[in-house]
Amino acid sequence: MTRDVVACERCPRLRAWCREVAEVKVRRFQDQEYWGRPVPGWGDPAARLLIVGLAPAAHGGNRTGRIFTGDRSGDFLFAALHRAGFANQPTSVARGDGLRLLDCYVAAAARCAPPANRPLPEEIGRCREYLAREWRLLRRVRAVLALGKVSQDAFVALLRGMGRVPPRKAFAFGHGVRHDLGEGLHLFASFHPSQQNTFTGKLTAAGMDTVLADVNRHLGRRGRPATRRTS
């Protein structure tokens, strides 16, 4: 499946943007070779936690070839995953940096870096097949953490397409909101760890720790007090 993701050309707008960014670069990364292709998900194949992000960053995953790697969002996320016991180290700098995910797998709603960090709905729809294939492979998942409303909507759309949730059931989004999807599967929500959210204090390290503590409690791992719950 990784080969299929990397070779994907379904979204001309996204492919053109990723290639342009990889060629032009930014000054601080002028000496680096950019990945410039779709970015596959990665992590523990026996994971019970699936994290769904939005898309690779233009100078993060699109540069390094690994989602949430080499950018400020990844710095924030993996530090939190390390504190919660889902990663063996707090940093994600580049492929081959020694980072391992423990009981956790990271995917995205869109696999190419989008202009202005905003993939179009139809582009997310074209990427859904890859998330569906990962979902079928990750047979032990009992917790899904959606980073942002768009990511949550993408995952819910996947479940609707599979007949896993009722067609008209509404899923409220909010930081710390939790939905029971039945059969032991719970959907957790967090604000996306973008600089816009972390630099303004909308999402804090303590706030992310609280959500991950709730995930840990659900999975029977060591955790902190639960977040608020809906559904």
Question: Which residues are covered by each model-predicted region?
Answer:
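Generic C-terminal helix-cap and adjacent flexible tail
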Residues: R217-S231
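A polyanion-binding, active-site-adjacent surface
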Residues: M1-F171, H175-V177, L181-R221
